[in-house]
């Protein structure tokens, strides 16, 4: 490499010497996923050849109920009868958050839904329309994320403009509702707020 110091202008050849791998706190790392599947194999005796199926099934289930530790999962893993999804989810928390795990498999979940023509279960309840229903899951941000696992054949199709817009709108509505529920006070002590919470204005206002 011709560049000798950090202040020396690098050539394109110099830059290509860097083998960068994208990573972010919002998506589980491959090492964390490997640690999770190792825990599953040791704890639940899941064969190595079905561990990927267990990951995909669990992430797909979270797309229906929300990627949160508070979400209620039902049923056994489609990968192995007798092992519940709830048990597998509990083991994830040792290594990363549920959201981080799901974000890693967002592209796989997206392809599963498109291939089976089955959108997330709560899309209508969350306010999505027919044309954007496949975006109706809370880790949709992981689709096309550089740190998320990409299927070998790529995506069946990328998200449409309508789907991207619908998801961003749903996120803003969720944030607004949360802020309205909590109020705008920075300090929540009763001595400061007198037990009151400042009102939050509407997300959309109309001219009089």
UniProtKB/Swiss-Prot annotation:
GO terms for cellular component: helical viral capsid; ribonucleoprotein complex. InterPro entries: Pltvir_coat. Keywords: Capsid protein, Helical capsid protein, Ribonucleoprotein, Virion. The keyword Ribonucleoprotein applies. Disulfide bonds: none annotated. It is found in: Virion. It comes from the Viruses. Its main location: virion. One of its GO terms (molecular function) is structural molecule activity. Required for genome encapsidation. Forms ribonucleoprotein complexes along with TGB1 helicase and viral RNA. Belongs to the potexvirus capsid protein family. This is Coat protein.
